[in-house]
Structures are given as structure tokens and as C-alpha cells.
Amino acid sequence: MDKYAVWGNPIAQSKSPQLHRYFAKQTRQNLDYVAILGDEEKFEQQLSDFFAQGAKGCNITAPFKERAFKLAQQHSKRCLSAESCNTLKKLADGTLFADNTDGAGLVSDLQRLNWLKPNQRILILGAGGATKGVLLPLLQAQQNILITNRTFSRAEDLAHKFNQFGTIEALDLKHIPIQTFDLIINATSTGLQGKTIDINPQILQLASAVYDMQYSKESDTPFIALCKKQGVTKISDGFGMLVGQAAHAFYLWRGVMPEIDPLFSGNEIKI
């Protein structure tokens, strides 16, 4: 049986094992997928041992995405632009191929929601790894991107790095123009600490739609709660992105794209 896993620290909260087992059953693929707690000091050796024991691939989550990127011998274009990976595949020659399916997962979810049309103005909150992982696919989807961040220089650096791929610019968080954005995406990690980014509430009130990359099964994320308080009605959390990135990783490994619609049409599985 082919072996796969997701690596992270912490890892107990990961929904990847449930998703990939569901995909395997749906597509009749014979595989085993588990969650593994990575050791921050020994991660590289752990991963090397994992593949030496015959594993076919794995997913990578925080805090190991950049370290896994450096271990791979080959990389997809979107992975190179992100400078981090969330998916590794062992090739026939024994080398590791790295991909980053986060952006593909986001784009596929925005398409599912019918929120993605050419030449929209999308404001992204945050200039960290989560943003870097989705910029290329969004720009390839002909979106006009504006990035804002608590540290403006980080937003400027990202805009400069990605302007070769499309229309992108940085905005000072304290001086975002009061105007309607087609979509606001929260890519900050503030929600993990129960906080929200310090943004002018008028910006949220005028937004056509808002999307939080974070996902919480138990309750609204802090960002979504804030948006609801400001009267925003067109809102989505990151569950669909989670499902989408997993589906694209599964396709990379197995050559078959799982059907994800059943996950949004009822409680077919517990995620």
C-alpha cells in the first residue's frame, strides 16, 4: 500500500488525513495517509527517513514549508515563486518534486463560489508566506492585486517580486483608500491568536465579498466575526481552500482529480 502523510508541528488539528482518505475511497486508490508530528530540530532527517522507507509523497504544513522547499531537487513554477512547498512527490529516479497547491486551492474555491471574474480588484491583508503562496495563481487568473501589511516594506517587497506576473501594488495599511474592493482576502495569521488585523472598518463595509484563509469548524474566525459585525454578508472561510489544495495535491500524486462538490452539499464526511 502506497504511503503518504502530512508533516507539521502542531499537527493534531490537521484535516488532511480525513480528506485524503475520503479522496482515496472515492477514486478507488489504495493508499495510507497519516499525520506526523515533525521535530523542529530533526525534521530534515525525519523526512529523509520517511522517503527512504518507501513513501510516495507528503503534505507539509507550518512550520516546515520553507525547509521542505529546500530539500527538493525539482520545483513547480508556483512553488518557486512561493519559495515554500506544501506538497512533495517522490519521482521514479528517487528525487523529490516540490509543489505549492495553496494558490490553486484558493482559486478553485473562488471559482466554486463564483467570486472570480477577470480584472477584479482584490485586496490581500498580510504579506507573509500565506500570501506569497497564492499570488502567482491569482495573477494568472487575471486579478489586480493590492497587498497591505502591518509592516509596509514587506508588502512593497512582495509587490516588487511579483510585478513581472501581473498587476500588483502595495498599500499602506493606515492609508488604504475608502473604496469598494471586489474581494478582500485575509491572509494574516492573527486569527490564530484570536485577534484581527487593524483595518479601517469602512474598508470592510464597502467590500463586495470577503474571504478568510483561516478555517474554524466550531465558530466564526475572528476576521469573519469582525466582517459580520460591519454588515458584510458575502463571506467565506478557508474550508474550500483547504479542500481544494488537498485535491490538487492528490492529483499530483495519483493522476486523478477527486470530486470535491459532495463536501459542500451536505455532511457526507466529518471534517
Swiss-Prot record:
EC id: 1.1.1.25
Domain of life: Bacteria
CDD domains referenced in this protein's UniProt entry, alphabetically: NAD_bind_Shikimate_DH
Key word Translocase present: no
Annotated positions binding NADP(+): G126, A127, G128, G129, A130, N149, R150, T151, F152, S153, R154, M213, G238
GO molecular function: NADP binding; shikimate 3-dehydrogenase (NADP+) activity
Pfam families: SDH_C (PF18317), Shikimate_DH (PF01488), Shikimate_dh_N (PF08501)
Task of the protein: Involved in the biosynthesis of the chorismate, which leads to the biosynthesis of aromatic amino acids. Catalyzes the reversible NADPH linked reduction of 3-dehydroshikimate (DHSA) to yield shikimate (SA).
Subunit structure: Homodimer.
Name assigned to this protein: Shikimate dehydrogenase (NADP(+))
Species annotation: Histophilus somni (strain 2336)
Gene name of this polypeptide: aroE
